[in-house]
């Protein structure tokens, strides 16, 4: 029996080989103890402030919503050390690993952002680091691969399956099942077996807490909606967590529609998948008629995931959060618009959330609304991808 609730409604759980159950129980207990230990909280918050650069800014866009009555703020997780929201929870889990007496860290990464965040935390805290990464992602994210290596991490390309994030996840779990006595598996999103979805949410929830305080100070009221992209869902749950009880605030998650929801090239399991067991949890999953996991697709490597965190599945099921999808082309347009109109280059992941917010503003230009987009990461890692696409289209 788990000590914390392992399920969100019908979703979640702990579907892992028996050999991993003691490791997950140990992790759950360490997390419970750490949450009650003021010294742990103080060390974690200290690292976030002095090393990572929290709190991050809440920036009012000046030009993007001209011609509409929408006020659009960006929560600037792109300004965090490491370039994305990933740094928050990685520091928390790395401290937990040290607390459990483990000196090795295993991680998986898609876009490379979680890998970079894990590598920097391991360098800072003196932990050995090995990162599993789909061979395809190693190719399309070479700057991040080099960053990880610079900080002392070993990057292990995974060639099995589609050679993307889901395969890296499987290899990382396989490694951990043989090494958990000395190694901690530092999972990169709010998904996977319990207690990971809960741990990652709690180590990301400062995003929404800060946003709430900042918007109240600036506007004197809560936003009408907070909007975040959803792959596994950690940046979104970090933004949503502190607003779930605020019923006037719409929670909007944006999945990748890829080349179109009506094609087989998208990554939107929440709205277009079926419930299944994957990566140690029960959650919506992209699967074929035989129940085999289908490949997800997105121009953004960090959203290219065939499932989604169980709390998002639950929030969707009870109608508390709403989930929509944005295509590659719409995300690319938003990416370029933000760069040109505000001088901010967003991650392709975050561009999906931004594109949705721009639709909300432009579809109803006379509506006075206050929106916050979680700008979960910066776009340095994506400039080569975007350059190649625009070149192919003859757009540059």
Swiss-Prot record:
Its EC number is 4.2.1.20. The modification N6-(pyridoxal phosphate)lysine is found at residue 86. It catalyses: (1S,2R)-1-C-(indol-3-yl)glycerol 3-phosphate + L-serine = D-glyceraldehyde 3-phosphate + L-tryptophan + H2O. Its cofactor is pyridoxal 5'-phosphate. GO terms for molecular function: tryptophan synthase activity. Pathway: Amino-acid biosynthesis; L-tryptophan biosynthesis; L-tryptophan from chorismate: step 5/5. Keywords: Amino-acid biosynthesis, Aromatic amino acid biosynthesis, Lyase, Pyridoxal phosphate, Tryptophan biosynthesis. Gene3D superfamilies: 3.40.50.1100. GO terms for cellular component: cytoplasm. It holds the Pfam family PALP. Tetramer of two alpha and two beta chains. Belongs to the TrpB family. The beta subunit is responsible for the synthesis of L-tryptophan from indole and L-serine. This is Tryptophan synthase beta chain. It comes from Vibrio vulnificus (strain YJ016). The gene is trpB.
């Amino acid at each position: 029996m788990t000590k914390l609730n392992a399920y969100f409604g019908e979703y979640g759980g702990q579907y892992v080989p028996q050999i991993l159950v003691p490791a997950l129980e140990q992790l759950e207990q360490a997390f419970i103890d750490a949450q009650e230990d003021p010294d742990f909280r103080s060390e974690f918050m200290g690292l976030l402030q002095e090393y990572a650069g929290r709190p991050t800014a809440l920036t009012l866009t000046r030009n993007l919503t001209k011609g509409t009555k929408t006020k659009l703020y960006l929560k600037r997780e792109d300004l965090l050390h490491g370039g994305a929201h990933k740094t928050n929870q990685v520091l928390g889990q790395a401290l937990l690993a040290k607390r459990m007496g483990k000196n090795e860290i295993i991680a998986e990464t898609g876009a490379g952002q979680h890998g970079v965040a894990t590598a920097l935390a391991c360098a800072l805290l003196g932990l050995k680091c090995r990162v599993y990464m789909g061979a395809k992602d190693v190719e399309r994210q070479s700057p991040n691969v080099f960053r990880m290596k610079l900080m002392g991490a070993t990057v292990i390309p995974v060639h099995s399956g589609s050679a993307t994030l889901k395969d890296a996840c499987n290899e990382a779990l396989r490694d951990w099942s043989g090494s958990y006595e000395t190694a901690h598996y530092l999972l990169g999103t709010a998904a996977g077996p319990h207690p990971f979805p809960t741990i990652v949410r709690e180590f990301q929830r400062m995003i929404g807490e800060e946003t709430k305080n900042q918007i109240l100070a600036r506007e004197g009221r809560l936003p009408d909606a907070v909007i975040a992209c959803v792959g596994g869902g950690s940046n979104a749950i970090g933004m949503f967590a502190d607003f779930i009880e605020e019923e006037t605030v719409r929670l909007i998650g944006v999945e990748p529609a890829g080349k179109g929801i009506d094609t087989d090239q998208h990554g939107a399991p929440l709205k277009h998948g079926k419930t299944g067991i994957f990566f140690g949890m029960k959650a919506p999953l992209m699967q074929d008629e035989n129940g085999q996991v289908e490949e997800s697709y997105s121009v953004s490597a960090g959203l290219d995931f065939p499932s989604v965190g169980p709390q998002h599945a639950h929030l969707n099921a009870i109608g508390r959060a709403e989930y929509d999808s944005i295509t590659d082309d719409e995300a690319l347009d938003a990416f370029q618009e933000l760069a040109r109109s505000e001088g901010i280059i967003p991650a392709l992941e975050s561009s999906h959330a931004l594109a949705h917010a721009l639709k909300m503003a432009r579809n109803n230009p006379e509506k006075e609304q206050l929106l916050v987009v979680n700008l979960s990461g910066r776009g340095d890692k994506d400039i080569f991808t975007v350059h190649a696409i625009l070149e192919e289209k003859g757009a540059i």
